[in-house]
Amino acid sequence: MRRPSLLLKDILKCTLLVFGVWILYILKLNYTTEECDMKKMHYVDPDRVKRAQTYAQQVLQKECRPKFAKTSMALLFEHRYSVDLLPFVQKAPKDSEAESKYDPPFGFRKFSSKVQTLLELLPEHDLPEHLKAKTCRRCVVIGSGGILHGLELGHTLNQFDVVIRLNSAPVEGYSEHVGNKTTIRMTYPEGAPLSDLEYYSNDLFVAVLFKSVDFNWLQAMVKNETLPFWVRLFFWKQVAEKIPLQPKHFRILNPVIIKETAFDILQYSEPQSRFWGRDKNVPTIGVIAVVLATHLCDEVSLAGFGYDLSQPRTPLHYFDNQCMAAMNFQTMHNVTTETKFLLKLVKEGVVKDLSGGIDREF
């Protein structure tokens, strides 16, 4: 039985947590992010559009180099990058394995039984056979950056073997610029598209699990069940009620990929127990997807990446009116470190930047 003093301490923590969440909610209601007028979006030079399209086509026309991405990452980061890392979870972790060392999203400590339950619902745990059969795969990771708008790269992006899209970034209405082919939609519950139109029957839905209720949500989506109301209370925004895909199209991202990205490659500090908030050590879904792509494909390209904070009035995304200045208010991610990482990959030739948001090569 717990001592009364410890019980009171736990009650106080819970009370303060609820109060803090309530305050943040009130602040959110009263805070309006500055909006950018998409109709007045900065002018896109037609010559630059042509150069971007030509460059992207040249990337595809060159002979694909087997294992190039993995080999390059291993040379660049040495022992900090594992060439043998599986991209998706295939079995529940044992206590002695790397997955059990950390809590989500860096591992599955104390969640082994939930992982096992999910895996039993998923008939497949790897890339589909038609993709595995390719001797050399080209990936493109499509970010949400406003820089994509106007480049008209859609047709070229559709020609990649594997097209990875992030969170709720839409295809409908933007296919001219971002294409309409999706191989992988990688996201967490709050980031999943709410519209059925953003899911195609052969997509892979790759779930990134951050917290306990994320497991409940994914189980409900796979089983096509309604998520209980009390579970919904633990999400910080509305989540999808249904994902119109068959169980064979769901995958669970290997959390060791997030751990490798955060602690080994970006060299963030490991998580520390804190009463409030969390360390700024969680990579963005975009950077995690780039590292995932190096494990999945032989060659990797990027499109729609890059934050130009010197242009605060330019659109942050290609699909909404949020300004670049909004990045100054986010506290979860270390944008500066991630930008340096992506720039290093582009400069060293590990990945190609098709839209020129990281380092223009055209």
Swiss-Prot record:
<feature type="topological domain" description="Lumenal">
    <location>
        <begin position="27"/>
        <end position="362"/>
    </location>
</feature>
<dbReference type="InterPro" id="IPR012163">
    <property type="entry name" value="Sialyl_trans"/>
</dbReference>
<dbReference type="InterPro" id="IPR001675">
    <property type="entry name" value="Glyco_trans_29"/>
</dbReference>
<dbReference type="InterPro" id="IPR038578">
    <property type="entry name" value="GT29-like_sf"/>
</dbReference>
<dbReference type="GO" id="GO:0006486">
    <property type="term" value="P:protein glycosylation"/>
</dbReference>
<dbReference type="GO" id="GO:0000139">
    <property type="term" value="C:Golgi membrane"/>
</dbReference>
<keyword id="KW-0808">Transferase</keyword>
<feature type="glycosylation site" description="N-linked (GlcNAc...) asparagine">
    <location>
        <position position="30"/>
    </location>
</feature>
<keyword id="KW-0328">Glycosyltransferase</keyword>
<protein>
    <recommendedName>
        <fullName>Lactosylceramide alpha-2,3-sialyltransferase</fullName>
        <ecNumber>2.4.3.9</ecNumber>
    </recommendedName>
</protein>
<keyword id="KW-0325">Glycoprotein</keyword>
<feature type="glycosylation site" description="N-linked (GlcNAc...) asparagine">
    <location>
        <position position="224"/>
    </location>
</feature>
<keyword id="KW-0812">Transmembrane</keyword>
<keyword id="KW-0472">Membrane</keyword>
<comment type="function">
    <text>Transfers the sialyl group (N-acetyl-alpha-neuraminyl or NeuAc) from CMP-NeuAc to the non-reducing terminal galactose (Gal) of glycosphingolipids forming gangliosides (important molecules involved in the regulation of multiple cellular processes, including cell proliferation and differentiation, apoptosis, embryogenesis, development, and oncogenesis).</text>
</comment>
<feature type="disulfide bond">
    <location>
        <begin position="139"/>
        <end position="297"/>
    </location>
</feature>
<keyword id="KW-0735">Signal-anchor</keyword>
<dbReference type="GO" id="GO:0047291">
    <property type="term" value="F:lactosylceramide alpha-2,3-sialyltransferase activity"/>
</dbReference>
<feature type="topological domain" description="Cytoplasmic">
    <location>
        <begin position="1"/>
        <end position="5"/>
    </location>
</feature>
<dbReference type="GO" id="GO:0006629">
    <property type="term" value="P:lipid metabolic process"/>
</dbReference>
<comment type="similarity">
    <text>Belongs to the glycosyltransferase 29 family.</text>
</comment>
<keyword id="KW-0443">Lipid metabolism</keyword>
<feature type="transmembrane region" description="Helical; Signal-anchor for type II membrane protein">
    <location>
        <begin position="6"/>
        <end position="26"/>
    </location>
</feature>
<feature type="glycosylation site" description="N-linked (GlcNAc...) asparagine">
    <location>
        <position position="180"/>
    </location>
</feature>
<keyword id="KW-0333">Golgi apparatus</keyword>
<feature type="glycosylation site" description="N-linked (GlcNAc...) asparagine">
    <location>
        <position position="334"/>
    </location>
</feature>
<dbReference type="Pfam" id="PF00777">
    <property type="entry name" value="Glyco_transf_29"/>
</dbReference>
<keyword id="KW-1015">Disulfide bond</keyword>
<keyword id="KW-1133">Transmembrane helix</keyword>
<dbReference type="InterPro" id="IPR051142">
    <property type="entry name" value="Glycosyltransferase_29"/>
</dbReference>
